[in-house]
Swiss-Prot record:
Protein name, as recorded: Nucleotide-binding protein BTH_I0482
Family per similarity comment: Belongs to the RapZ-like family.
Molecular function GO terms recorded: ATP binding; GTP binding
Organism: Burkholderia thailandensis (strain ATCC 700388 / DSM 13276 / CCUG 48851 / CIP 106301 / E264)
Function, in words: Displays ATPase and GTPase activities.
Taxonomy of the source species: Bacteria, Pseudomonadati, Pseudomonadota, Betaproteobacteria, Burkholderiales
UniProt binding sites for GTP: 57-60
Length: 297
């Protein structure tokens, strides 16, 4: 059975991700107590169901300590994938303010003895980060701070499409002016490269468009940087495999996330596609939703 566990910070988009998986044919359960998961998986398998998605958050805090061992045990019998959603505190505060929802850890002592005294929204967010942090190392992280809901749905679908028999290498382009991604394992700053933005004909285009590709591809300094990043990754990928890493996210950043970072992310994804399962995604580039994330074969 394919089991997708969705966890992370409240307000980061777990409901959006769960809905995307439901649309993809998964049997979905929100806020399932972790200790019930093995029994549910057995029951659904006996019923002929082969895809299950479960959202787990800090409301299950009493059982979160069991999750690492539970994930290992389930992985021996099933294809288990963990998706960890995160977002900046500023983004989360804005989302809770807009929806007027209460954070699950900002309760009063009369309703939640484990939480204690009523805390501010920011304190509740930081407390939840501490509670769910151990789960981040088991899964693929997505920083949803600057993502629209339809883009997140596309990224989730790409996540479940990739094979689970090898390391998944994720290249993510972004713009520094919108903040650095929280999900990056490695981050490369390519702002030192010549910027197509200053060519008025190239300014409205992206690193996916042929004129921008031709501009950057003609520059020796661009190929030097590409070669250095590629050599670094090729050297260290075997060590990450030996460490049983399932996912590795490499973020490539330029000023706006539109030209240079997109071109380098695409080029590196193509070059490394024989070294690992590769996904490339573009956080800030003004591209079509389907082009914002894709498998590289």
């Amino acid at each position: 059975m394919r089991i997708v566990l969705i966890t992370g910070i409240s307000g980061s988009g777990k409901s959006v991700a769960l809905n995307a998986l439901e649309d993809a044919g998964y049997y979905c359960v929100d806020n399932l107590p972790p200790h019930v998961l093995p029994e549910l998986a057995r029951h659904l398998a006996n019923e002929g169901q082969n895809r299950l998605a479960v959202a787990i958050d800090a409301r299950s805090s009493a059982s979160l300590d069991e999750m690492p061992g539970l994930i290992r045990a389930l992985s021996r019998e099933h294809d288990v994938r963990v998706l960890f959603l995160n977002a900046s505190t500023q983004s989360l505060i804005q989302r809770f303010s807009e929806t007027r929802r209460r954070h699950p850890l900002s309760g009063s002592p009369s309703h939640d003895a484990d939480v204690g005294l009523l805390v501010s929204l920011e304190e509740a967010i930081e407390r939840e980060r501490d509670l769910v942090a151990p789960l981040a190392e088991f899964g693929h992280q997505i920083d949803t701070s600057n993502l629209r809901a339809n883009v997140l749905r596309t990224w989730v679908k790409r996540f479940i499409e990739q094979k689970n028999d090898d390391l998944v290498l994720m290249f993510e382009s972004f713009g520094f002016k919108r903040g650095v991604p929280l999900d990056a394992d490695f981050m490369f700053d390519v702002r030192a490269l010549p910027n197509p933005y200053y060519d008025h004909e190239l300014r409205p285009l992206t690193g996916l468009d042929q004129p921008v590709v031709a501009f950057l591809d003609a520059l020796p300094v661009v190929h030097q940087m590409l070669g250095d990043i590629e050599s670094f990754l090729i050297k260290w990928l075997p060590h990450f495999r030996e460490d049983n890493r399932s996912y590795l996210t490499v973020a490539i950043g330029c000023t706006g996330g539109q030209h240079r970072s997109v071109f380098l992310a695409e080029t590196l994804a193509a070059r490394l596609s024989r070294q690992a399962n590769v996904i490339v995604r573009h956080r800030d580039a003004p591209v079509a939703v389907d082009a914002s994330s894709r498998l590289v074969t």
